[in-house]
Amino acid sequence: MKIISIEGNIGSGKSTFFRFLENYYKDDPKIIFLDEPVSLWESIKDTDGENILSKFYKDQTKYSFQFQIMAYITRLSLLRKISKEKDIIVITERCLYSDYYIFAKMLYDQNKMTEIEYQIYMKWFYEFEEEFKVYRMFYISVNPDLCFERIKQRSRGGEDSISLDYLEQCERYHEEMINIMSKKISCLTIHANMHITNDQYKYWAVLLFDQCT
């Protein structure tokens, strides 16, 4: 099993590219798609009906550990369900490394996750890291200002609290992750501040699967 992760900031267009790939390769039984389990996150609600994703964006200090553990477990669960499949390529929308190097690390650095919480999180990460190593990362790099405008335009539930400053921080941690991971695996960076056509998506798909089979 080879895992290829589509990476990018919130609003970078990674989900759009992921959907394009999913449709483009829909008839290939050897390619499996695992999107970011947002629907699972949105299903976890308090007694007032507010989901954990919305609560996290509103109060990251209070909900950082709960959210990151939940995100890790849901990603891990999806991977485990297909782990017995042989000779397949798995395309994921973000991955366990994204959670670790970007979101958990950023929350810890900002003192929104305590030392004990971060150590517990790292125990979870290292326990399963070897089991689900990523073969390649495909990073869609987009200016945070453009990401911010896209987020406002799409008005997705739970995202109304996302600030430009948060997106700028996310970009920095994405870049740091790619720098670290590029020393271990194949990492491709695509700059996508322009409108992307279907022909460009097809070219990206060629790059994505180069030497994977």
Sequence positions of predicted segments:
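A glycine- and Lys/Arg-enriched "phosphate-lid" helix/loop adjacent to the NTP-binding pocket
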Residues: 100-172
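NTP-dependent small-molecule kinase module
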Residues: 148-213
